């Protein structure tokens, strides 16, 4: 089943939300609003603002940057917004890239597959509240036990009672990341996605992830939520020209000259 969403994205030098469009999408039965972030406006605050002025539409991040937040901070934010919105939040996560992780957030980009798996695992533990949080992994350790630890940290359980199954979506591009997404996430946020090439490019990777997940997971209970640019214009050439700058930014100008994950 196909559902429609509205991508609000992130701001330029000033944040201006298209509230007329947002309210219309809510009234017309659109499935979700999606926000994003780079190194300016964040993805969550606009959703809180829009969520307070809508009733039905789901509120998704596409994406919240994992390097910018600890897993616990992300889980706290997700639980808070989900409860305030009446269970409408969709947690979309992504690693961004080395340029933003290291150049903006000041943390190592590291090993994306391992970090993503642990990050999602910690978030789900916090949502479920089955026990106090303990995680001992290669990339994250909770409670912190490093050489500079005080030794006073102890396992904690969220005070806020959350919906235990807040949906988690992952943005992924590389084959191994796509497989990981199908294995551990509830949905996938692909970029520059062409449905006609799904079988030849992505199907094997997605099916491999489903097989690793087990439990009857498959395309029937997994969301694929690509974003596309829609331009309404009687002049086809003019419509093309309005789309080209965004594509050029990601394909040719995003990241470093010798390392761009989008091309």
Where are these regions (language model features)?
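Conserved, mostly hydrophobic/aromatic
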Residues: 29, 50, 81, 123, ...
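N-terminal small/glycine-rich loop or linker at the start of catalytic domains
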Residues: 1-9, 60, 98-101, 140-165, ...
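Short, acidic/polar
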Residues: 13-24, 77, 172-180
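Active-site-adjacent beta->alpha loops and helix N-cap segments on the catalytic face
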Residues: 41-48, 194-209
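Hydrophobic faces of well-ordered beta-strands that scaffold small-molecule active sites
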Residues: 4-8, 33-35, 59-62, 89-93, ...
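An alpha-helical appendage that flanks or caps ligand/catalytic pockets
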Residues: 110-158, 199-263
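Glycine-rich anion/phosphate-binding loops
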Residues: 67-80, 110
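N-terminal beta1-alpha1-beta2 module of alpha/beta enzyme domains
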Residues: 1-61, 67, 166
């Amino acid at each position: 089943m196909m559902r429609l969403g509205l991508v609000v994205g992130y701001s330029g030098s000033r944040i201006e939300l298209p509230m007329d469009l947002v309210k219309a999408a809510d009234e017309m039965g659109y499935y979700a609003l999606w926000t994003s972030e780079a190194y300016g406006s964040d993805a969550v605050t606009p959703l809180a603002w829009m969520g307070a002025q809508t009733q039905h539409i789901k509120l998704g991040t596409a994406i919240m940057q994992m390097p910018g937040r600890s897993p616990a901070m992300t889980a706290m934010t997700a639980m808070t917004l989900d409860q305030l919105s009446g269970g409408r939040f969709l947690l979309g996560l992504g690693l961004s890239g080395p340029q933003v992780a290291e150049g903006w957030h000041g943390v190592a980009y590291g090993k994306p597959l391992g970090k993503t798996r642990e990050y999602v695992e910690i978030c789900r533990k916090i949502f479920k509240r089955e026990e106090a949080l303990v995680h001992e992994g290669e990339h994250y350790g909770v409670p912190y036990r490093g050489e500079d630890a005080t030794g006073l940290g102890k396992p904690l359980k969220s005070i806020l009672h959350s919906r235990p199954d807040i949906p988690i979506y992952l943005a992924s591009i590389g084959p191994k990341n796509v497989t990981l997404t199908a294995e551990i996430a509830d949905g996938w946020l692909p970029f520059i996605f062409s449905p006609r090439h799904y079988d030849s490019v992505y199907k094997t990777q997605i099916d491999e992830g489903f097989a690793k997940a087990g439990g009857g997971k498959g395309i029937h209970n997994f969301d694929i939520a690509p974003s596309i640019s829609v331009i309404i214009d009687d002049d086809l050439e003019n419509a093309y020209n309005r789309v080209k700058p965004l594509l050029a930014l990601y394909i040719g100008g995003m990241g470093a000259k010798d390392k761009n994950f989008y091309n």
